[in-house]
């Protein structure tokens, strides 16, 4: 029979374990998934800025949603717990995404909610993350991008009475219903990476505000546009600079080539029976990128001349750089998915082609075997001859 002190110790350990478990659950929900809520009434006369990372004037941004290669962001409305007409909900939701498409982003509905980037569902009270408080108060909440498993989720309070009309007269009076359009329009901004704004004219203002539909001509405010531009369109413009003189050190591909498959041609050697020359080495780096990458011989003293870029069938742009001391030739080349290289109609002999070691298996995956063979032969001939 355990003593009273031992029983008290067991109860103390059980309470401690429950407390630790509760704290861990709280951290898993609220730290890995940054949730931002929308309230009907501003009780303190100020805007709750939520989880603020970076501030720009009135708007605040978190991080952009992961946009796939085709540039299309998919969204889905779940049928579970939806007490409204599903087709009407989807139609109004599509109208809200059309407003955000003014920023240049492309949205597409899908029926696969498990694969959609933005998922809209109806929840009530306790549902595993941030609780709702019933009718009135909190209207919805959304999870910011890149913050955990719930990133991109929009939860609408199912205890609220939402209206789907676009008529301003339907929202007059003290007991007027809540507009589903304005609510989901605000929450979509959170899933795109926008935080609350201090501007009452902005869609991302922290509290629900009755707005005019303007006969269907709903537009985003300048504050909302600035936030999207800062997240998605700030790094679109890039400049290309060409080097006419030999750099002090051998250049390497820039950051846009990090995840691309690279073709490297090495161990290029030119033999001359009349004069003994040391073994020369060169390297050609080719990657799938819109930028050009310069490669030159290690022992090249200076560039003798530089020819104009030639384009064949709009697939390949090739620039040939001749080296003064007859070392291996360097190139600037651009790859657009299919490559065919021609060097001024000059065909070299086979023993010159064999003087380079080419890794044909390391060519980009978009090239077929015929293209790989032609690319290897052409670039080997060009690289290893004068």
From Swiss-Prot:
Cofactor detail note: Binds 1 zinc ion per subunit.
Key words, A-Z: Glycoprotein, Hydrolase, Metal-binding, Metalloprotease, Protease, Signal, Zinc
Sequence positions that bind Zn(2+): 186, 190, 196
Residues of this chain annotated as glycosylated in UniProt: 14, 58
SMART domains, A to Z: ZnMc (SM00235)
Enzyme Commission code(s) on record: 3.4.24.-
Endpoints of the signal sequence: 1-34
One Gene Ontology term from the biological process aspect of the record: proteolysis
Region listing for Disordered, in residue ranges: 235-258
SS bonds (residue pairs): none
Keyword Protease part of the UniProt annotation: yes
Active-site residues, as the UniProt record annotates them: 187
Keyword Plastid: no
Pfam families, sorted: Peptidase_M10
Cofactors required: Zn(2+)
Gene Ontology terms, MF aspect: metalloendopeptidase activity; zinc ion binding
InterPro entries: MetalloPept_cat_dom_sf (IPR024079), Pept_M10_metallopeptidase (IPR001818), Pept_M10A (IPR021190), Peptidase_Metallo (IPR006026)
Family, similarity comment: Belongs to the peptidase M10A family.
Annotated protein name in UniProt: Putative matrix metalloproteinase
Organism: Spodoptera frugiperda ascovirus 1a (SfAV-1a)
Lineage: Viruses, Varidnaviria, Bamfordvirae, Nucleocytoviricota, Megaviricetes
């Amino acid at each position: 029979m355990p003593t009273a002190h031992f029983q008290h110790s067991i109860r103390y350990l059980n309470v401690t374990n429950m407390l630790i478990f509760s704290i861990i659950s709280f951290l898993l929900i609220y730290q890995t998934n940054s949730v931002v809520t929308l309230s009907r009434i501003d009780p303190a006369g100020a805007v709750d800025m939520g989880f603020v990372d970076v501030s720009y004037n009135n708007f605040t941004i978190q991080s952009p949603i992961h946009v796939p290669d085709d540039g299309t962001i998919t969204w889905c409305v779940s049928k579970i717990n939806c007490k409204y007409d599903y087709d009407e909900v989807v139609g109004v939701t599509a109208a809200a995404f059309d407003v955000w498409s003014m920023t240049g982003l492309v949205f597409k509905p899908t029926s696969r909610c498990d694969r959609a980037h933005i998922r809209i569902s109806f929840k009530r009270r306790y549902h595993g993350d941030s609780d709702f408080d019933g009718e009135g108060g909190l209207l919805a909440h959304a999870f910011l991008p890149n913050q955990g498993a719930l990133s991109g989720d929009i939860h609408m309070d199912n205890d609220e009475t939402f209206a789907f009309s676009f008529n301003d007269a339907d929202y007059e009076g003290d007991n007027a219903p809540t507009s589903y359009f304005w609510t989901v329009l605000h929450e979509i901004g959170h899933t795109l990476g926008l935080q609350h704004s201090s501007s009452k004219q902005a869609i991302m203002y922290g509290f629900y505000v009755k707005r005019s539909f303007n006969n269907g001509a709903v537009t985003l405010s300048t504050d909302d546009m600035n936030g999207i531009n800062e997240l998605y369109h700030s790094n679109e413009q890039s400049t290309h600079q060409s080097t006419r003189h030999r750099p002090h050190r051998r250049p390497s591909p820039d950051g846009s080539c990090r995840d691309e498959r690279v073709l490297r041609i090495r161990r290029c050697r030119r033999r001359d029976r009349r004069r003994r020359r040391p073994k020369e080495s060169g390297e050609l780096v080719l990657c799938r990128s819109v930028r050009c990458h310069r490669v030159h011989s290690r022992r090249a003293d200076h560039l003798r001349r530089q020819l104009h870029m030639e384009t064949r069938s709009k697939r390949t742009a090739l620039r040939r750089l001749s080296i003064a001391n007859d070392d291996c030739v360097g190139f600037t080349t651009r790859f657009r998915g299919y490559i065919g290289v021609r060097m001024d109609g000059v065909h070299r002999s086979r023993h010159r082609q064999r003087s380079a070691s080419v890794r044909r298996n390391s060519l980009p995956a978009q090239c077929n075997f015929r293209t790989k063979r032609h690319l290897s032969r052409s670039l080997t001939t060009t690289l290893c001859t004068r």
